């Protein structure tokens, strides 16, 4: 794979420059910008002479209540990331407009919507800016109806004013912030890093082939610090094209969550070389071509991993309940009324309730997959095939976060249940399935993976390159090996070998065939349940993902 192909995957963060930076920085310095929009005012601030060099420190007041952000470069530098070329005592209007354009790449810190600048000290959208202004201009007494743990994202931000305000305050929004006219050097560098990251993420997800329609703004993850324990509280994004099927492989429910169009004839998948960074684990993937030049690997591997790890870690954090919430739920005394409610469920009711919970989890898995760098550039057929055959496997990995192995408990929606209460079933084969799922999840939990390692592991499981039916195997192989290289680095940095030369990574890879077996057992159990209870209706996405006519072909490869 050459430089241009890595640039296709990782966008403006590739290639890195010789000084450890990224090529995107120099690109952003000289972008031509339109004149300042109406209402934007430039304020001249006093300048100082430092060692004979004039550094004009300018501020910018974008909108009412906005912080005047510093655009001056650090001492000794003539220009910074935002392209602020200083001439005399005045800042170029194009450069000032560029500042706002660069900041707006970063989503609103409160809800994840498109930001419009720095407001009250925090990068936010117009909606959250106005909400915070109103909350400060009048006496308010907001109340939370949901235990003060509501999701605050673009879809849900108006549902709970209390949690929205608390998040604004937690992020540092303040009326006093308006008085401070410029960012510190450390703050500027942090914003620069965020801009580079979001540029790379947008390029990786929007520069896809014509057959993959992807709304980058719509798919920007919320930066919410709260998350419902109940997975169904996290809605999927709906597409206006959800009434279309896709190539016979995906129906309305999956296309709604994937935001894809019906496939046009003779679509060409993106062209990725068969070259890839090799991964020297016990698993030896099928060879599909040559490898990257050794000198190039040595120069590039660290930068690839850095972008990949950051993308996956954020995707994981935004599609899972916070660990703090999970631990808090385990510390609470048991809710007897909820325990009695679940104990009184019939076999059929428990089946449907599990399907409902699993569907909510899979909605988040789909969102996670779309944020894996390069995933949205695969052909649509391969994207859907990987999700259909891998979503149940990822659900098992995610279940490991919701288990207390010492107490033998599981967080099931919004209630903590003893695992033994989940094993009751009429058919011994169903008991074997449930026990197998919990055993696999407990094995992962006992390895004490970090959140970053769990994110990388999910990427490995989903991108397992030998799934039957995939067309773009070289591309999937490439993405898989990038994740493998990053995963190996994380594991070697954080974990000692388990026994002899057996590593944590060896154990994790050895569990993947078990996941596939459990996925098949789930399909067989579903088939038996449908035969015995044909009148029961399952959630549309669940029914579509686990339709026997398609998934069995994929998983039996």
Curated annotation (Swiss-Prot):
ZnF (NR C4-type) intervals: 108-128, 144-168
Alphabetized Pfam families for the sequence: Hormone_recep, zf-C4
Domain of life of the native organism: Eukaryota
Induction (free text): By ecdysteroid.
Region called Disordered, residue ranges: 1-34, 203-230
Chief localization: nucleus
GO cellular component: nucleus
Cellular compartment(s): Nucleus
PANTHER family assigned to the protein according to its UniProt record, in alphabetical order: NUCLEAR HORMONE RECEPTOR HR3-RELATED
Function: Putative receptor whose ligand is not yet known.
Protein name, UniProt field: Probable nuclear hormone receptor HR3
Organism: Galleria mellonella (Greater wax moth)
Source taxonomy: Eukaryota, Metazoa, Ecdysozoa, Arthropoda, Hexapoda
Gene: HR3
């Amino acid at each position: 794979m050459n430089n241009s192909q890595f640039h296709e995957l990782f966008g403006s963060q590739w290639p890195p420059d010789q000084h450890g930076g990224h090529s995107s920085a120099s690109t952003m310095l000289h972008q031509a910008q339109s004149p300042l929009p109406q209402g934007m005012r430039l304020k001249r601030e006093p300048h100082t002479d430092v060692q004979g060099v004039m550094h004009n420190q300018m501020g910018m007041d974008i909108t009412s209540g906005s912080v005047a952000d510093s655009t001056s470069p650090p001492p000794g530098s003539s220009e910074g990331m935002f392209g602020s070329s200083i001439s005399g005592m005045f800042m170029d209007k194009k450069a000032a407009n560029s500042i706002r354009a660069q900041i707006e790449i970063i989503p609103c810190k409160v809800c994840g919507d498109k930001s419009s600048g720095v407001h009250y000290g925090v990068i936010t959208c117009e909606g959250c800016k106005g909400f915070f202004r109103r909350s400060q201009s009048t006496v308010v007494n907001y109340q939370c109806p949901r235990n003060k743990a509501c999701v605050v994202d673009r879809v849900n931000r108006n549902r709970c004013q209390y949690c929205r305000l608390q998040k604004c305050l937690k992020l540092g929004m303040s009326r006093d912030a308006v008085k401070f006219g410029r960012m510190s050097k450390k703050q500027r560098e942090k914003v620069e890093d965020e801009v580079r990251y979001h540029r790379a993420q947008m390029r990786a997800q929007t520069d896809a082939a014509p057959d993959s329609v992807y709304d980058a703004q719509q798919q920007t993850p919320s930066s919410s610090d709260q998350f419902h324990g109940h997975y169904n509280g996290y809605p999927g994004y709906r597409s206006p094209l959800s009434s279309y099927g896709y190539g016979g492989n995906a129906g309305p429910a999956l296309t709604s969550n994937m935001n894809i169009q019906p496939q046009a004839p003779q679509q060409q998948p993106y062209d990725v070389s068969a070259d890839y960074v090799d991964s020297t684990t016990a698993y030896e993937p099928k060879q599909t071509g040559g490898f990257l030049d050794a000198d190039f690997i040595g120069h590039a591997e660290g930068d690839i991993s850095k972008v990949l790890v950051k993308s996956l870690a954020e995707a994981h954090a935004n599609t899972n309940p916070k660990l703090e919430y999970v631990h808090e739920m385990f510390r609470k005394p048991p809710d007897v009324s909820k325990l009695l409610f679940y104990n009184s469920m019939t076999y059929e009711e428990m089946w449907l309730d599990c399907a409902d919970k699993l569907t909510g989890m899979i909605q988040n898995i789909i969102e996670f997959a779309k944020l894996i760098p390069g995933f949205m550039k695969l052909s649509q057929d391969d994207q859907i095939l990987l999700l259909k055959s891998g979503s149940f496997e990822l659900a098992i990995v995610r279940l490991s976060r919701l288990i207390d192995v010492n107490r033998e408990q599981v967080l099931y929606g919004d209630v903590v249940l003893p695992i033994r209460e989940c094993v009751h079933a009429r058919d011994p084969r169903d008991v074997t399935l449930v026990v197998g799922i919990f055993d696999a999840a407990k094995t992962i939990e006992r390895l004490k993976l970090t959140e970053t390692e769990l994110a990388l592991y999910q990427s490995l499981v989903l991108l397992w390159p030998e799934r039957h039916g995939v067309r773009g195997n070289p591309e999937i192989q490439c993405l898989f090996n990038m994740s493998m290289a990053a995963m190996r680095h994380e594991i070697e940095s954080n974990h000692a070998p388990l026994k002899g030369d057996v590593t944590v990574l060896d154990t994790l890879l050895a569990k993947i065939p078990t996941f596939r077996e459990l996925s098949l057992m789930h399909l067989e159990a579903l088939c038996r349940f449908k035969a015995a209870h044909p009148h029961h209706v399952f959630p549309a996405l669940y029914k579509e993902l686990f339709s026997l006519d398609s998934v069995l072909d994929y998983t039996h490869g």
